[in-house]
């Protein structure tokens, strides 16, 4: 991504972001074979098509992962990017009513609501009729209705560069409905390694860190990651069983044990689990040019 490639809008006013990623979790026509005709279109509207596909790692299970990255020597130490992450799978039919009640709506009820409102991120707005410059009827967002839909939060595990460091960050959220205002997020440069930053429901832990200058350049670096995903208590919002994280880094016939099978809170209290994606995920409003190579992803359940 170049300096002018931050084109995704809808975040903070006047802020755009840059993304270029490949996801291991996806669905094909075969995954919808035998389902009712409207199953696919309904899933599109609810943004849950990928929930029907391959690559999902259920909450509370144990997995081994591997992938490789090649960082060019000319990459600036000022970049702020996540190059690999495991993401949660929020269910948008989980909603919060104006009176604060959290409930899971039947798909038909959620879709009926969606027909009468405008949903942006996690906020539900009144749908207001207006006309565009050509005189055509269009809908725009009016006042917030007080309803919110589940949108997810920070990735449960991320590998990236920020503030002149390479870092591995694990996040946990035991809240049944994600509180987007709870910005519990460990700073890659300031947080102590393996000392979680916590709020009432969340934990964010820098599991490993090294100066950007020490990260191997112009060669393939292979990561082997073993995760026992934390088991959560659903609506009870409890930790049933903490997780574990083990990370090896290999290059030039050498290995480095970055995270030594540490007990850690890692995951989200979603009904579904997690999926892997890698690429360029610019963080914040960074426009520093980013280019690197990624390859060799594989996962298996242990």
How would you label these PLM feature ranges?
Residues 1-302:
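Low-complexity, Ser/Thr/Pro/Gly-rich disordered linker/stalk regions
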């Amino acid at each position: 991504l170049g300096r002018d490639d931050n084109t995704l809008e809808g975040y903070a006013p006047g802020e755009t972001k840059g993304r270029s990623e490949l996801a291991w979790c996806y669905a094909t026509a075969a995954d919808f074979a035998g389902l009712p005709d409207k199953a696919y279109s309904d899933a599109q509207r609810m943004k849950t098509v990928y929930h029907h596909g391959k690559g999902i790692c259920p909450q509370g299970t144990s997995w081994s992962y591997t992938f490789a990255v090649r960082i060019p020597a000319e990459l600036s130490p000022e970049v702020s990017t996540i190059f690999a992450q495991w993401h949660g799978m929020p269910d948008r039919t989980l909603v919060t009513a104006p009176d604060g009640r959290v409930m899971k709506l039947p798909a038909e009820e959620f879709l009926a609501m969606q027909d009468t409102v405008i949903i942006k991120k996690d906020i539900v707005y009144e749908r207001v009729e207006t006309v565009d410059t050509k005189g055509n009827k269009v809908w725009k967002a009016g006042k917030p209705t007080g309803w919110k839909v589940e949108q997810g939060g920070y990735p449960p595990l991320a590998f990236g560069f920020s503030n002149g460091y390479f870092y591995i960050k694990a996040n946990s959220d035991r809240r049944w409905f994600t509180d987007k205002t709870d910005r519990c997020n460990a700073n890659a440069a300031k947080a102590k390694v393996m000392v979680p930053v916590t709020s009432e429901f969340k934990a964010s832990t820098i599991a490993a860190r090294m100066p950007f200058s020490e990260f191997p350049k112009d060669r393939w670096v292979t990561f082997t990651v073993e995760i026992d995903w934390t088991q959560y208590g659903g609506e009870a919002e409890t930790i049933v069983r903490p997780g574990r994280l083990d990370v090896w880094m290999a290059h030039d016939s050498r290995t480095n044990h970055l995270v030594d099978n540490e007990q850690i809170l890692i995951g989200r209290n979603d009904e579904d689990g997690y999926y892997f994606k890698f690429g360029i995920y610019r963080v914040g409003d960074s426009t520093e040019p980013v280019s690197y190579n990624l390859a060799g992803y594989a996962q298996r359940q242990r």
